[in-house]
């Protein structure tokens, strides 16, 4: 597996993963274009030159970042790809001086919540009906400090 920068020409392949994993709640091409245009940090994980996962990080303030998303193709889940992407994002947050990292995760996504807990994220609250149109709640998690 190789982790590298997500570039504009990767967006169509990323959208295929988005559609499969998130259906009507998927991000659009314009959303990814916007993230890249704002200079946010986006990475892809590839195997045999195919994208198998991706993740993004945005700096909110000089010392605070948010994990925008992490997603792994269904047929490649449970292989450590999401963890590798998370480590990459956390390392970049530390390089940029972010000492507080925030993320939202669906309340019904226990595997992701467990991964985030292993990396020092703790629950901070619930955002009701965060994911639309399903109305699924999101658990907000926060990581303070720099130990990855």
For every predicted segment, state its role:
Residues 5-75, 86-88, 92, 96, ...:
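Acetyl-CoA-dependent GNAT
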Residues 93-104, 127:
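Conserved GNAT acetyl-CoA-binding A-motif
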Residues 78-93, 110, 114-118:
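Conserved acetyl-CoA-binding loop-helix of GNAT-fold acetyltransferases
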Residues 104, 117, 122-138:
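Conserved catalytic-core motifs of GNAT/GCN5-like acyltransferases
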Residues 1-3:
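Extreme N-terminal starter segment of soluble prokaryotic enzymes
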Residues 7, 73, 77, 106-108, ...:
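Residue-level recognition of the GNAT/N-acetyltransferase active site
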Residues 63, 99, 122:
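Short acidic/polar active-site loop segments enriched in Thr and Asp
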